[in-house]
């Protein structure tokens, strides 16, 4: 009998082992769809981004006009831009839900997969930040100024570092040029990191909602989960096209329709919605360096998740106390997101400070304690 090319060809064999004959737990729910949704988001962003880059000019005098030209004069340029801008929002919705799933079901115990995932998140955040600067509107310019300025809080080397990042003494043409270069490069780095992420995942196999070994109950990925993933793709694209066609500017800032002007500061400088929770944590500390450290800690704290797991059970499926804390954490993040969009005045300042404190308390203290408490309850 001739060998099956799908199983013998060096390249097809890799595809086969990852997407066709991959042994998959039979009971994984729709929460396990977000990994593939992130993959399709990345492909969509790279394709639309490539088409936009063909019409973009990375120059402070021309950037805003070139984006306007793309929307007005290029065939379906408006659609490509709207898909790209709103695709970023959906990318973040998917990654946050993917991380939430990881925390709820104890997926962080696959340490290598979890750590590469956090590095992917950081790279995605960097990509989104430099991309937001490119249209060179008011919020692009001032957002870039405020966020890059945070590096000046680093003792001794801070100011030098900022000027080195800017390529001058303020955000200007060199900054825009290098941000465009970075925005073009980073998605390919994300694609490479994704392969590493998947390599580590396929070493251990997928987790499942029960958090127990599923070796005795695995089914091939294709056709069962490939069809389930395609349904997810259809829903994602339906959501993306609905957003891009009916309310493309829903998640954007009206300030960005004004060309960048270094002499006029917008009344409220704020990042895109997906960074607002971190921005609220940054603003909740009245000290520059302290704020920067809290901002970094808000994401880097995820690296500690595997070490803070004290429960004998992997998932939260049968742990009602931990479930309550998890949903409290989700609610708290929504409150932080809302606070990040509000001006710095009473009562938003104190709400932001309390929400920031709660965020760190839940992750660092309450979840481990609750895990240990539930172990005790199991003995009775």
Curated annotation (Swiss-Prot):
Pfam family example for this protein? Cytochrome_B
An additional note in the Swiss-Prot or TrEMBL entry is: Heme 1 (or BL or b562) is low-potential and absorbs at about 562 nm, and heme 2 (or BH or b566) is high-potential and absorbs at about 566 nm.
List keywords of the entry alphabetically: Electron transport, Heme, Iron, Membrane, Metal-binding, Mitochondrion, Mitochondrion inner membrane, Respiratory chain, Transmembrane, Transmembrane helix, Transport, Ubiquinone
Record: residues binding heme b b562: 84, 183
Give the family from UniProt. Belongs to the cytochrome b family.
Organism field:
Caracara plancus (Southern caracara)
Q: What biological function has been recorded for the protein in this entry? A: Component of the ubiquinol-cytochrome c reductase complex (complex III or cytochrome b-c1 complex) that is part of the mitochondrial respiratory chain. The b-c1 complex mediates electron transfer from ubiquinol to cytochrome c. Contributes to the generation of a proton gradient across the mitochondrial membrane that is then used for ATP synthesis.
Query: What are the TM regions of this chain, as residue ranges?
Result: 34-54, 78-99, 114-134, 179-199, 227-247, 289-309, 321-341, 348-368
Q: What is this protein called?
A: Cytochrome b
Q: Which SUPFAM superfamilies match?
A: a domain/subunit of cytochrome bc1 complex (Ubiquinol-cytochrome c reductase), Transmembrane di-heme cytochromes
């Amino acid at each position: 009998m001739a060998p099956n090319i799908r199983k013998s060809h060096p390249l097809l064999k890799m595809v086969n082992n990852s997407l066709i004959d991959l042994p998959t737990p039979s009971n994984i729910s729709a929460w396990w769809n977000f990994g593939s949704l992130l993959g399709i988001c990345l492909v969509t962003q790279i394709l639309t981004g490539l088409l936009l880059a063909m019409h973009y000019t990375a120059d402070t005098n021309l950037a805003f006009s070139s984006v306007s030209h793309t929307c007005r004069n290029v065939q379906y340029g408006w659609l490509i831009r709207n898909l790209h801008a709103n695709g970023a929002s959906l990318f973040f919705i998917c990654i946050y839900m993917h991380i939430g799933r990881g925390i709820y079901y104890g997926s962080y115990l696959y340490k290598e997969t979890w750590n590469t995932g956090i590095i992917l998140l950081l790279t995605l955040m960097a990509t989104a930040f430099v991309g937001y600067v490119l249209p060179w509107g008011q919020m692009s310019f001032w957002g870039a100024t405020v966020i890059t300025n945070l590096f000046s809080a680093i003792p001794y080397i801070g100011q030098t570092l900022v000027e080195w990042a800017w390529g001058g003494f303020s955000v200007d043409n060199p900054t825009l040029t290098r941000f465009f270069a970075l925005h073009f490069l980073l998605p390919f780095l994300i694609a490479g990191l994704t392969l590493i992420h998947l390599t580590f995942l396929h070493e251990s196999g997928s987790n499942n909602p029960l958090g127990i070994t599923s070796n005795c109950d695995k089914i091939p990925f294709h056709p069962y989960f490939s069809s389930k993933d395609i349904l997810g793709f259809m829903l994602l694209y339906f959501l993306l096209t609905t957003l891009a066609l009916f309310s493309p500017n829903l998640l954007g800032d009206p300030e960005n329709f004004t060309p960048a002007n270094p002499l006029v500061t917008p009344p409220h400088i704020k990042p895109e919605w997906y960074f607002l929770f971190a921005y609220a944590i940054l603003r909740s500390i009245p000290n520059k360096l302290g704020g920067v450290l809290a901002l970094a800690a808000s994401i880097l704290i995820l690296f500690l998740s595997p070490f803070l797991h004290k429960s004998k059970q992997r998932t939260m499926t049968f742990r009602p106390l931990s479930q309550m804390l998890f949903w409290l954490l989700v609610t708290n993040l929504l409150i932080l997101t809302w606070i990040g969009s509000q001006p710095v005045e009473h009562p938003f300042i104190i709400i932001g400070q309390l929400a920031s404190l709660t965020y760190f308390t839940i992750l660092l203290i309450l979840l481990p304690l609750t895990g240990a408490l539930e172990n005790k309850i199991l003995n009775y």
